[in-house]
């Protein structure tokens, strides 16, 4: 569906590796990043997106005349939309294979996301397939573009995504180095389980997060839980 809306608004697509092959296999046109940058992937794919043509196109400020002159001089095209799915690091951890785990630490993806999120005034960044429908609606509403408010929300979500991803890498490395002194900083990354009926007081909002992707609590009956209901449930457990 996302490819359909991109085609509808004549968006030129850049992609790499397996994504490039899949897009073309589905019958849509895309340009391989190595062709766009004129720089091949190296080190078994470890280096494929680090190039000024990409980061310049993402990071330059559209209303900055100095930036405009620089990108024109070195022939950099603007990049208005960045869509990235990170390597499945958490799934790799479950295998227990250290080599596989290390190779699934995504470097290029989070870097692209952070660049796009920093320049949210001009760039839309997508980090979750659940955001595709919202993006499609925005592009249809704004004739191929998106609103600033939408981009700001996505920027926040993008930094949450990279922060969570780094937290999981840190957790793995902490467990792999049990004999080392405790780290000076501690990161905690959680996933939203559900939004509660209200917080400690009826006028407050509340949500439940889990350190894992799922939480082993099942509500058998009754209305939706509030913050106080959840606290009492956990106490009784």
For the regions a language model picked out, list residue spans one by one.
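Glycine-rich nucleotide/cofactor/substrate-binding loop typically near the N-terminus or early
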Residues: 18-89
């Amino acid at each position: 569906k996302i490819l359909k809306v991109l085609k509808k608004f004549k968006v030129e697509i850049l992609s790499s590796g397996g994504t490039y092959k899949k897009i073309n296999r589905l019958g849509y046109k895309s340009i391989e990043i190595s062709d766009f940058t004129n720089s091949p992937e190296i080190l078994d794919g470890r280096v494929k997106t680090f190039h000024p043509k990409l980061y310049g196109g993402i990071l330059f400020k559209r209303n900055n005349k100095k930036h405009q002159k620089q990108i024109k001089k070195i022939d950099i095209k603007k990049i208005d939309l960045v869509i990235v799915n990170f390597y499945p690091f958490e799934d790799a951890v479950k295998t227990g294979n250290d080599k596989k785990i290390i190779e699934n630490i995504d470097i290029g993806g989070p870097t692209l996301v952070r660049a796009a999120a920093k320049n949210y005034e001009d760039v839309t960044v997508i980090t979750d397939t659940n955001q595709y429908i919202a993006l499609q609606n925005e592009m249809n509403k704004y004739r191929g573009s998106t609103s600033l408010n939408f981009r700001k929300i996505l920027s926040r979500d993008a930094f949450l995504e990279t922060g969570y991803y780094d937290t999981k890498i840190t957790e793995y490395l902490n467990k792999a180095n049990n004999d080392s002194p405790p780290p000076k900083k501690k990161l905690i990354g959680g996933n939203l389980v559900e939004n509660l009926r209200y917080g400690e007081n009826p006028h407050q909002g509340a949500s439940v997060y889990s350190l894992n992707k799922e939480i082993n609590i099942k509500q058998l009956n009754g209305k939706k839980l509030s913050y106080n209901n959840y606290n009492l449930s956990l106490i009784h457990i």
